[in-house]
């Protein structure tokens, strides 16, 4: 790998670490029910929720369905796992299937990342990333 490429990767890594919104827009893909794998484009209100998550680690979001908050939470969880390894992520839901769905979203995003953004070792348990 050339020094130029290493420098670009290092700069991009630092940029991703500094901004979860940038990381999600640039490198996260989601599974759309009709269009398949698509880039995760944040809506303006999702940017606001993301800022809320960053400024208030214990956030409660009153929301309606189909706003993409679960997907946003999955992306934020992935960002935290990659760039804040001193943190633990716990997913609690009303049903086990809902929690498993969140883990599936995170895994899908993780699997779509470029290799230089992925962790070197991946846990073997199905409910962990």
Question: For each predicted feature, which ranges?
Answer:
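Phosphate/NTP-binding elements of NTP-utilizing enzymes
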Residues: 2-129
């Amino acid at each position: 790998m050339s020094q130029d490429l290493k420098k670009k990767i290092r700069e991009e890594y630092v940029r991703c670490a500094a901004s979860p919104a940038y990381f999600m827009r640039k490198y996260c893909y989601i599974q759309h029910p009709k269009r398949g794998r698509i880039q995760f484009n944040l809506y303006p209100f999702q940017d606001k929720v993301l800022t809320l998550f960053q400024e208030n680690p214990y956030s409660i979001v009153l929301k309606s369905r189909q706003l993409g908050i679960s997907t946003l939470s999955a992306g934020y969880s992935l960002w935290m796992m990659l760039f804040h390894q001193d943190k633990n992520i716990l997913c609690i839901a009303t049903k086990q299937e809902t929690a498993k769905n969140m883990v599936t979203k995170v895994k899908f995003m993780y699997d779509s990342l470029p290799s230089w953004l992925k962790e070197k070792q991946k846990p073997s348990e199905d409910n962990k990333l």
